[in-house]
């Protein structure tokens, strides 16, 4: 009995030491260093596969040499009718991300009357939605030939028929945009599967630039999500969009603007690299 108690005490002490060591390492871990010593990472995302993104946003991004992420609603008419154009977007170095097949959202919150009954997230099971999202990855691979992917949750809704659906999908994606929020407060504690986004709609170029400046001041990252650009819905003006791109392109020493996929691949790699060797071995 005494031997068992002594062994249990030693085991508890060992576990406590590992936890304390991990906490100390985390609290003293250095700020994440961005490529080329940039002060912030900027992820520009465009949701819902809209015509204005192909007609206005993509040419503007290419003109400024900036890479972005396009989260396709794969059942949309724009994907079906302009598939070749989306393939060119991927060939230009932009990311095609998964935004589900049909953009299901919960119809129950206020101001959600635009959600049709057949696309009501409250009436589809989590298992059905997971299967659809995985099919979406297969369709995306048929478009761009890539296997690594990120996901953006429509409307930021995390439940289907009241059941969480993201957990089974974590192995299918490098990272997920599934929360709201602008500038990331701490890269070391960021949950790669609950990254927050700032949805930009009816804002000025100055307001968009102020967002990325806040990220530079924090030394972290900002995720700006657009829908329409100079048209469609939840739109920003072509002028505001152009002003942001021009600012980012002229301050490449400060901002690393890239796809969400590449940014999060880098973040994950740096986190592992920054861990003390002894801690990495202990946690393996």
Language model features with spans:
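Metal-dependent polysaccharide deacetylase catalytic core of the NodB/CE4 family, i.e.
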Residues: 40-42, 62-161, 171-172, 179-195, ...
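Generic structural signal for well-ordered alpha-helices
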Residues: 54, 58, 83-87, 130-137, ...
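Bacterial N-terminal signal peptides that target proteins for export
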Residues: 1-11
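N-terminal signal peptide c-region/cleavage motif recognized by signal peptidases
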Residues: 20-22
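Active-site metal-binding loops of divalent metal-dependent hydrolases
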Residues: 46-49, 100, 228, 260
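Soluble non-cytosolic domains of exported or imported proteins
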Residues: 48-52, 80, 123-131, 202, ...
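C-terminal domain-boundary segment and adjacent tail
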Residues: 28-36, 68, 78, 141, ...
């Amino acid at each position: 009995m005494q031997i068992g108690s002594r062994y249990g005490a030693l085991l508890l002490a060992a576990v406590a030491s590992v936890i304390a060591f991990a906490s100390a390492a985390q609290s003293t871990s250095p700020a994440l260093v961005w490529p080329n010593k940039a002060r912030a990472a900027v992820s520009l995302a465009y949701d819902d596969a809209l015509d204005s993104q192909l007609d206005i946003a993509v040419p503007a991004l290419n003109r400024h040499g900036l890479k972005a992420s396009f989260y396709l609603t794969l059942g949309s008419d724009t994907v079906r009718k302009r598939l070749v154009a989306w393939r060119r977007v991927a060939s230009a170095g932009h990311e095609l991300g998964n935004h589900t097949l049909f953009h299901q959202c919960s119809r129950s919150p206020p101001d959600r009357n635009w959600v049709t009954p057949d696309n009501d997230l409250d009436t589809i099971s989590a298992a059905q939605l997971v299967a659809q999202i995985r099919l979406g990855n297969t369709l995306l691979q048929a478009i761009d030939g890539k296997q690594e992917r990120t996901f953006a949750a429509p409307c930021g809704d995390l439940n289907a028929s009241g059941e969480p659906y993201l957990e089974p999908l974590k192995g299918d994606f490098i990272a997920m945009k599934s929360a709201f929020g602008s500038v990331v407060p701490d890269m070391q504690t960021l949950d790669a599967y609950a990254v927050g986004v700032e949805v930009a709609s009816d804002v000025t170029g100055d307001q968009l630039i102020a967002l990325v400046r806040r990220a530079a001041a924090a030394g972290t990252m900002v995720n700006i999500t657009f829908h329409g650009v100079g048209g469609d819905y939840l739109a920003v003006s072509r002028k505001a969009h152009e002003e942001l791109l021009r600012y980012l392109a002229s301050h490449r020493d400060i901002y690393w603007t890239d796809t969400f996929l590449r940014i999060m691949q880098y973040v994950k790699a740096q986190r592992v690299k920054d861990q003390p060797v002894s801690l990495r071995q202990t946690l393996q």
